[in-house]
Amino acid sequence: MHYDPIKRQAGRIFRSKGGRVVFFRLLNLLLLRSWYIRKEIRKWARFATPDASVLDAGSGFGQYVHYVSKLSGNFTVKGIDVKEEEIEICNRFFRSDGHGSKIVFEKADLTTFVEPDAYDLILCVDVLEHIQEDVLVMENLQKSLKKGGCLIISTPSDKGGSDVHKNGDTSFIEEHVRDGYAVEEIEQKLGRAGFRRIESLYSYGKPGQLSWKLSMKYPVKMLNLGKVFFLVLPLYYLVIFPVAMLLNSRDLYKKHSSGTGLIVKAVK
């Protein structure tokens, strides 16, 4: 299943300033990983300096940059991505939103991007599973953090991530170069990259897995059949939305012994 074309189409639909804000709110509600990432950002922000610098490594639509910018207007935030179209859209939106030089987006490849000792927080949300040279990226992000800075990662786990549950299954998202990480694997790789304190927790337990199927997997499968299904989606979500919200909330506040996602925090 090709996921990127659907994402590009959605991003183009919500290009206007008001549309982009609505789009961010929808993403934050529907994507369970956003619930986890925003929770971790809030924890970090309680102890952050007023002039903290943040990097979103693989910024995509820019929803996490937008969230961080609303926590404090004094934070300096940079988003980087390999997709030039998204970089242009994000720069245009944030300039129109009055952020000036505090927020900027740049095209960059994480396998070569390094800004030594520049950031207090780096986000890497659903990115590493797309990159073969993952340890190299981890090393670059470690170098780019200030001492004591924190890296927050969201990625599929090896417990059914990318909808791969047994031998012979293929990834739901064909753009992934790996189906998911074992906790031991990603922690060892981060240790090799120079991080000194690493914490991992499972996301997408049973409630989250059901929510993901209802709110993401089935709609994406429909949209891959044809663009006409964009007309059906509002009615579909009208029914599914309350159920997905209850499931996401349940997943966020329950400790999982296993899950199809991982949230990892690593400190330099």
Q: Locations of the language-model features?
A:
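Conserved N-terminal segment of class I S-adenosyl-L-methionine
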Residues: 1-117, 121, 125, 135-138, ...
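A transmembrane-helix-recognition feature enriched in membrane-embedded lipid enzymes
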Residues: 226-253
